[in-house]
From Swiss-Prot:
One of its GO terms (biological process) is positive regulation of carbohydrate metabolic process. This is HTH-type transcriptional regulator MalT. PANTHER family: DNA-BINDING TRANSCRIPTIONAL ACTIVATOR DEVR_DOSR. Disulfide bonds: none annotated. ATP binds at residues 39-46. It comes from the Bacteria. The keyword Transcription applies. Positively regulates the transcription of the maltose regulon whose gene products are responsible for uptake and catabolism of malto-oligosaccharides. Specifically binds to the promoter region of its target genes, recognizing a short DNA motif called the MalT box. Residues 832-897 form the HTH luxR-type domain. One of its GO terms (molecular function) is DNA-binding transcription factor activity. Belongs to the MalT family. Keywords: Activator, ATP-binding, Carbohydrate metabolism, DNA-binding, Nucleotide-binding, Transcription, Transcription regulation.
Length: 903
């Protein structure tokens, strides 16, 4: 819950001086990116902007306190202020901020600006007391904010110090409206107005001017003069002499003498006790002071001018002026030192009763009351955890003495989950083992349910570490004892079980477990796990060869991301990457490339090492197009990321795929041999991850002419793929087997492997996997088409593959271009008939397409001409070549290509 007073405009006080000369300057605020009110405490910064804001619509106000140095808290309140200003226009940004589903503050602000791009009219955001921010990450994000905010948005910052926001650059570019101490100091006219409002006996103009000069227009000093002059035996002139030359850091003695000592003991105790609160309402005042009429007392003190401000129009929330608040807290520590822990304890109870555990934690920490801190955590820690309040939880758990933490095993479990969520994976088991040992030594009982929750977390750690057997045992044992009410641990254990089956190649068992995980996670709003389960389902379906079903599952995942605003999570990149893989398989290369590029964009706010697999996909897209130079650029980027980084074998396998294909296309045996000497050779190949690594190895062995070794590898891969029903892997393996057989002149076995690959492709939809094999694949497909040896579906796919090879690779159509024809006609062995009666350029193109296996209609579509025109071209070229039918034309084209060294 957000504290309403932090988002409320301060109420405009009745007896304040209207700063007309400054309001005129502020009237042009909409013309600037930043309006900065920068001066020491007590010069009326907040009051001035409150006066100006009273006439503004579409304005959000955010009052900072020390706790706002947590980036997540800062983001949540800032977006909430924008939402109040826009009437809820930025709902997506609000959801992201509340669930902490963004990579960093800059990424969140980028989404905010996207939503504000269609906001019409001026928009203002006021951030008060910015000097309290000491977090460099927030400063950096606000510099990003100022660079990229929409033109119609003005940021207004109130600060005692010059904020680290690139102010000089804004000033040079005339994008800064700045008001400082000299402008905010009262002039003589304003001082006269002030005293007329505050004193029962008016001062002469000359007297008020002298008083103003003596305190250099410092508003707080004038307020203190007015307050002191109400006391017996005091005068405005005496007060001014005491205040002359003082500043905010030397006021304590004066405030004691002239303010605190002048109120009765009851009011003094009331002020000091209330000072522990950063903001207060009647319920909190009752908790701290025992006064049932606390709000009336506040209103009375406000009338006396005691630096108390209303924070909202409903007059429910109050706060002290920052200068007075600092003074009161210092006096409270001095005068009520023994009572102070009790006051913070009462404040914590008050905030808990209002439903603000984060504020309660602040006071429990201030009180040093670890028992209360423990009680708050036991009641609210998991809610804070699921709302990603990780920094706050870490602060709490650090403050708890370890013996107290282990006396409450659920907090020890929370500490381990916190490490897991902060990606400190190596610490998780250590924390759990340390806690279990401490509990055992202290004879603290741990029931079966809690032990099962420990086991579920350990299972997650084990599967992350690549230990599926250990993970399976831990997850299975956990599920035996976890009741349905402990849904989070059950979701984790079920997910791990499904992932174990996936890793073992037991896809038929893995899929329903992941479907069950998704259902449970959706039911209990654990959307991160629901998304993870959908990603796993998609990968399983791809491995089973059901790419269309995988595509549809991905659509569900995209919908979940949109609904729950998960766009900035790394799992979104995972989804885009596997979408790219499916599209690449279907030779929808433009879409595949777009998905991979979006994945890279998602990861722009994370470590660049995470971009490895998307860059590898972009390399594969270039390879499928035959663009080797562009592919090499991406491959080099992948190699640079891999250098000096530690990656899981799955990542390395995917990054190596385009490398080995590139070596095959370029004949780079040196690089291939070097890689083969160094690459990891897994002990098994019983899942699609390991199949991919061994397939890379087999391809390199073929490149190097080590055919016997490659055949052993491929035979085992095919056997495992058939046994485990890894249909997509079998499809890929058979294509590599085809390459092996073709290069070793075993044409019958090559044809058999190719036909089975085409049959499997009816299920997988594979196109690009065939295309990257290039000319050898094209020759075999043409032969199968000419022999009419394929069923209709396979025939259609073969023609589509040929078309893509012709379009993207070194192919027959390209060979019959003008340069090729010029060389052909000057070749000494060219047939005399062709030399004396050369074909036109269009006829050469048609011959190339006939040789590539295209039908007349397909040639017409390819060249975008009428079918009758194609028949005319064919009749003419037959006559010029001296052939009678299509088969003879293909043979003649084959002879010409052989003569030129292309086949």
């Amino acid at each position: 819950m957000l504290i309403p007073s932090k988002l409320s405009r301060p109420v405009r006080l009745q007896n304040t001086v209207v700063r007309d000369r400054l309001l005129v300057k502020l009237s042009s605020a909409a013309n600037y990116r930043l309006t900065l009110i920068n001066c020491p405490a007590g010069y009326g910064k907040t009051t001035l902007i409150a006066q100006w804001a009273a006439d503004q619509s579409n304005l959000g106000w955010y009052s900072l306190d020390e706790s706002d140095n947590q980036s997540e808290r800062f983001a949540t309140y800032l977006i909430a202020a924008i939402q109040l200003a826009t009437g809820g226009h930025c709902s997506k940004s609000e959801a992201l901020s509340q669930k902490h589903q963004y990579a960093n503050l800059s990424a969140l602000f980028s989404q905010l600006f996207i939503e504000l791009s269609n906001w019409d009219g001026p928009l203002y955001l006021v951030i008060d007391d910015y000097h309290l921010i000491t977090n460099d990450a927030i400063h950096e994000a606000m510099r990003f904010f100022l660079r990229h905010q929409p033109e119609n948005l003005t940021l207004i910052i109130l600060s005692r110090t010059l904020p680290s926001l690139g102010i000089a650059n804004l000033r040079v570019r005339d994008q800064l409206l700045e008001l400082g101490m000299q402008q905010l100091a009262f002039n003589h006219h304003e001082a006269q107005q002030f005293f007329e409002c505050r004193l029962s006996s008016p001062l002469e103009q000359g007297d008020s001017s002298r008083l103003c000069d003596e305190v250099e227009g410092w508003v707080t000093a004038l307020q203190l003069i007015a307050l002191s002059s109400r006391q017996p035996n005091s005068s405005a002139q005496k007060s001014a002499k005491r205040l002359a030359g003082l500043n905010a850091s030397h006021l304590s003695d004066y405030l004691v003498d002239e303010v605190l000592d002048q109120v009765d003991s009851k009011a003094r105790a009331f002020l000091l006790r209330c000072s522990v609160l950063r903001s207060m309402n009647d319920a909190l005042i009752v908790r701290l002071t025992g006064e049932d009429n606390g709000q009336q007392l506040l209103e009375e003190l406000e009338r006396q001018g005691l630096f108390i401000h209303r924070m909202d129009d409903s007059a429910e929330w109050f706060c002290f002026h920052p200068l007075f608040a600092t003074f009161l807290r210092q006096r409270c520590q001095w005068e009520l030192a023994l009572e102070l822990p009790e006051l913070h304890h009462a404040a914590a109870e008050g905030w808990m009763a209002l439903g603000y555990p984060a504020e309660a934690i602040h006071h429990a920490l201030a009180a040093g009351d670890v028992g209360m801190l423990r009680d708050i955590l036991l009641q609210h820690a998991w809610s804070l955890f699921h709302h990603s309040e990780l920094a706050l939880l870490e602060q709490c758990l650090t403050a708890l003495p370890y013996p107290l933490l282990v006396q409450n095993p659920e907090l020890a479990l929370l500490q381990a989950w916190l490490a897991q969520s902060q990606h400190r994976y190596s610490e998780v088991n250590t924390l759990l083992e340390q806690a279990e040992l401490a509990m055992q030594e202290r004879k603290i009982p741990v029931d079966e349910i809690l032990r099962a929750e420990f086991g579920a977390l350990r299972a997650q750690v084990a599967i992350n570490a690549g230990k599926p057997d250990e993970a399976e045992k831990l997850a299975t044992d956990a599920l035996k004892y976890l009741p349905m009410a402990h849904y989070y641990s059950r979701i984790v254990a079920t997910s791990v079980t499904g992932e174990v089956h996936h890793c073992k190649g037991e896809l038929a068992r893995a899929l329903p477990m992941m479907q069950q995980t998704e259902q449970m996670a959706r039911r209990h709003e654990a959307y991160h796990y629901a998304l993870w389960a959908l990603l796993q389902q998609s990968e399983i379906l791809i491995a089973q060869g059901f790419l269309q079903a995988a595509y549809e599952t991905q659509e569900k995942a995209f919908e979940l991301i949109r609904e729950q605003h998960l766009e900035q999570l790394p799992m979104h990149e995972f989804l885009l990457r596997i979408r790219s893989q499916v599209l690449w398989s279907w030779s929808r290369l433009d879409e595949a490339e777009e998905a991979a590029r979006k994945g890279v964009e998602i990861l722009a706010n994370y470590q660049p090492q995470q971009q490895l697999q998307c860059l590898a996909m972009l390399a594969k897209c270039s390879l499928a197009r035959g663009d080797l130079d562009n592919a090499n650029v991406y491959i080099q980027r992948c190699e640079a990321l891999q250098h000096g980084s530690q990656y899981h074998l799955d990542w390395i396998t995917n990054a190596d795929k385009p490398r080995v294909i590139h070596w095959q296309m370029t004949g780079d045996k040196v690089a291939a041999a070097s890689w083969l000497r160094q690459t990891e050779k897994p002990g098994m190949a019983d899942n699609h991850f390991l199949q991919g690594q061994w397939r890379n190895i087999a391809r390199v062995q073929i490149i190097l002419g080590r055919f016997d070794e490659a055949e052993v590898v491929l035979d085992e891969l095919n056997e495992n793929a058939r046994r485990l029903r890894l249909t997509s892997d079998l499809n890929r393996n058979l294509l590599l087997s085809n390459t092996l057989y073709w290069q070793t002149e075993r044409k019958g076995e090559a044809q058999k492997a190719l036909i089975e690959s085409l049959t499997l492709a009816n299920r997988t939809g594979f196109i690009s996997h065939f295309v990257i094999e290039g000319e050898a694949m094209a020759q075999q497909l043409r032969q199968l088409i000419q022999l009419n040896a394929l069923p209709e579906l396979e025939q259609h796919r073969a023609q589509r593959i040929l078309k893509d090879i012709n379009q993207h690779h070194r192919h027959k159509f390209a060979h019959f271009d003008e340069i090729f024809v010029d060389k052909l006609l000057t070749h000494p062995q060219v047939p005399e008939l062709i030399r004396t009666s050369p074909l036109t350029q269009r006829e050469w193109q048609v011959l190339g397409l006939i040789y590539s296996g295209y039908s007349n209609d397909q040639i017409a579509n390819e060249l975008d001409v009428a079918a009758t025109t194609i028949k005319t071209h064919i009749r003419n070229l037959y006559q010029k070549l001296g052939v009678a039918h299509r088969q003879e034309a293909v043979q003649q084209a084959q002879r010409l290509l052989q003569m030129m060294g292309y086949v």
